[in-house]
Amino acid sequence: MASPGSGFWSFGSEDGSGDPENPGTARAWCQVAQKFTGGIGNKLCALLYGDSEKPAESGGSVTSRAATRKVACTCDQKPCSCPKGDVNYALLHATDLLPACEGERPTLAFLQDVMNILLQYVVKSFDRSTKVIDFHYPNELLQEYNWELADQPQNLEEILTHCQTTLKYAIKTGHPRYFNQLSTGLDMVGLAADWLTSTANTNMFTYEIAPVFVLLEYVTLKKMREIIGWPGGSGDGIFSPGGAISNMYAMLIARYKMFPEVKEKGMAAVPRLIAFTSEHSHFSLKKGAAALGIGTDSVILIKCDERGKMIPSDLERRILEVKQKGFVPFLVSATAGTTVYGAFDPLLAVADICKKYKIWMHVDAAWGGGLLMSRKHKWKLNGVERANSVTWNPHKMMGVPLQCSALLVREEGLMQSCNQMHASYLFQQDKHYDLSYDTGDKALQCGRHVDVFKLWLMWRAKGTTGFEAHIDKCLELAEYLYNIIKNREGYEMVFDGKPQHTNVCFWFVPPSLRVLEDNEERMSRLSKVAPVIKARMMEYGTTMVSYQPLGDKVNFFRMVISNPAATHQDIDFLIEEIERLGQDL
């Protein structure tokens, strides 16, 4: 294991584990030896201690090992201001950190050095000369490092090395040339908020254990409902572990609204329920139906037009078919920003149909909800205010660190009635404050992570206008890419017309295929192009873009932009890199 006294780590050169008042001990000499750099100090310490006194392998008592690693504070200040260079991580374990006696100084030093690793990673994430990914195949990583869990603890030097190794092979999702997922970017205020949230380490189920966070969730959800267009921000909502769970919440509440007895008696007490969503919608709708006992066969996929938008006439036709069979339509899930095409279903037309047949209307705006922050683009969600529930993921288009997904419900109190179980050890009715702030009983979870603070703090730092500028920039970059490649040799668009969102879908056609007729052989060969280029991107580590087939369309690239760090130059680079990597195919 490399010494922390050299190279990347630069943790300092002194070991404070010795007893300064007893210079005759090996420990005191070790402290002197630690003044040598380049790892020599650690080697000298090993010689001075001998094999029998190595803290990690000695096999001696816990007390003797702790004494060997003891770090004494001499500054008498709170917090401790002793130089971190006095700490030798090779001689320390997690048990030497707080709440250990005299654990303050090594704790501060250790966390500061973890922070240094993180900060270097943050800086590298925005450096275009660094790789987006240092790709290794799974078997290579498994063979190159020992990832197994052991019975005996490792020292803190090794723990810091694990931190470095983990980040070395992690995807730099904040890199300006990472376009692979809907969630990209690395916001500094959001990152700081996430660190604070983890430090507070509390749960969101009652006001008494999360007073500030519960209030911030109340304020933030109300603001989001106002932006949707519900009068005065009325309604309800909750932050959940992602858009898939938010969509399942909507399905759960819609079912309860129509058949409240299902909560106690189960699906056997209700007729067969049918949900409707577009054929381009997110797979989470079917997952939710499976989890809730409704069944995937009870999710009817509605046809889309060539741009990926739900066709209202087909929706109404399928509703009538279901009703004629004696089944009960209970939910229509429209999509505002589909995952692949970035399409926006015609919400006003869908709302009219839902009103006509008295069906719960849900809008999955996990990807497109961020456009509500933009005066220029929010028209694409016209009609969202007529929905009964909305999924909105700020961790996507708004760049909030994962995870941050909200379900907003128009009817106040419905979520509480649907999910509450009155656990008396948490939700006592005789508390000395307003019990409406004990939000945990309306959630499916008991333990619930604090997801709101990242969004709230970013909103305070950026303002609504800052989010608007972020979103407008990303959509402008998508239009820039579209305008470059729509008539460029070697590119074919998957659908005609300017994209509505930042999704730009296209094929790159290598020179060898450009002369072929548009037939089955050409399509078969074209389907193999995107996977090979993507693999080469990852091998070189220069950029990342997703690809997929859809319906009768063979593998194509789906470019999405949600990272405000991206520029026109990064789009130019992407085009050139695709051409470089695909010319010989």
Curated annotation (Swiss-Prot):
Transmembrane segments: none annotated. One of its GO terms (cellular component) is axon. One of its GO terms (biological process) is cellular response to brain-derived neurotrophic factor stimulus. PROSITE patterns: DDC_GAD_HDC_YDC. Its cofactor is pyridoxal 5'-phosphate. Changing C80S: No effect on palmitoylation. The keyword Phosphoprotein applies. Its main location: cytoplasm. InterPro entries: PyrdxlP-dep_de-COase, PyrdxlP-dep_Trfase, PyrdxlP-dep_Trfase_major, Pyridoxal-P_BS. The modification Phosphoserine is found at S3, S6, S10, S13, S17. The modification N6-(pyridoxal phosphate)lysine is found at K396. It comes from the Eukaryota. Changing C82S: No effect on palmitoylation. It catalyses: L-glutamate + H(+) = 4-aminobutanoate + CO2. Catalyzes the production of GABA. Belongs to the group II decarboxylase family. Homodimer. This is Glutamate decarboxylase 2. It comes from Rattus norvegicus.
